[in-house]
Every structure is written in C-alpha cells, then in structure tokens.
Amino acid sequence: MRTIGVISDTHGLLREEAVDALKDSDLILHAGDVGGAGILEVLSGIAPVFVVKGNNDYDEGASNWPKREVVHLSEGTSPVLAYMLHDISDLDLDPSSVGFAVVVYGHSHRPAMEWSGGVLYFNPGAAGHRRFNLPVTVGRLRVDERGRVSSEIIELEETI
C-alpha cells in the first residue's frame, strides 16, 4: 500500500498539525498557493514532493514550478497516474480518456472527493489560514497493490 499526502493553499503557513498528518506519506502533492519554498523544504524532509504553481505563488522559486504536473502514484506493473493543477476550472483535458485515475486540485479551499467517469477528483481543502468559514484540512490517498485508490480528508485541530 502506498500513501500519498495531499496538501494545498498553505499561503505561507505550514501548521504542525499538517506536518503530523502527512508524516507517514510515501509521496506528498502540494496543489498550489504554497506561500514560500520553505514550506516545500519541510515537506521534502518527510517524502518526495510534487508541486504546482497557484495563483498566489509569486516568490522567486515559484517561477520554476509547473502549472500542471503528472505524477505516478503507484509502483509496479499497474500504473496509477494523477494529474495535478491548482484550479479545476483550468482542466484542459478529459482525464479518463488519457488514463488518469486521479485529478488533484486546490484553489477553492473546499475539500472535495468526487468520483466521475472512473476518475477521482480530489481537493484536500486549505491547510493554511482559515478562510470562508471552512475547515482546515489536508488529504490522503492510498493506492493498493492492485492499483485501487482510496481517499480521505483529514480535518486538523487548530492551534494557531
């Protein structure tokens, strides 16, 4: 079983609770609006990190981040591919027709897990500052040996 931590919209705040929730990840996906490369440095101390640029990522390092990313979530013979982007309204392809099992996105700060056409559309919500009266969350994907994907949203206890 492979565990993928998913985080988005940290906006410069990486909560200790988020780090704890992601600590057993084999891979971490950040769906944008990071708010500084220091956050990625901390996350990369846990597991390899993939990131896409969000609409508020203006710092110097962010200029090199892709707007879209393809990530292999599984190891072995049955590949499980994820397509990452920050804003789902910028989705520029039909994920099921090109073989993606998961679309990971952020931007709205609203956690979401929805299956459509055999594809999981997954937004971990926002892990940074609370906004819009929404919970502070991260996500987790699990991929088993047969390539089956399961997902969960983890609501964080706030200490800030």
Set out the residue ranges of the language-model regions:
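Helix-adjacent hinge/juxtasegments
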Residues: 50-90, 97-99
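Active-site metal-binding loops of divalent metal-dependent hydrolases
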Residues: 8-12, 32-34, 55-57, 86-89, ...
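General small-molecule cofactor/ligand-binding pocket signal
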Residues: 5, 50, 72, 152-154
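N-terminal active-site segment of His-dependent metallophosphoesterases
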Residues: 1-49, 57-67, 134-137, 160
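Structural motif
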Residues: 4, 27, 80-82, 102
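Conserved beta-sheet core of the metallophosphoesterase superfamily
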Residues: 50, 81, 88-152
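Short, solvent-exposed aromatic-acidic interface loops
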Residues: 150-160
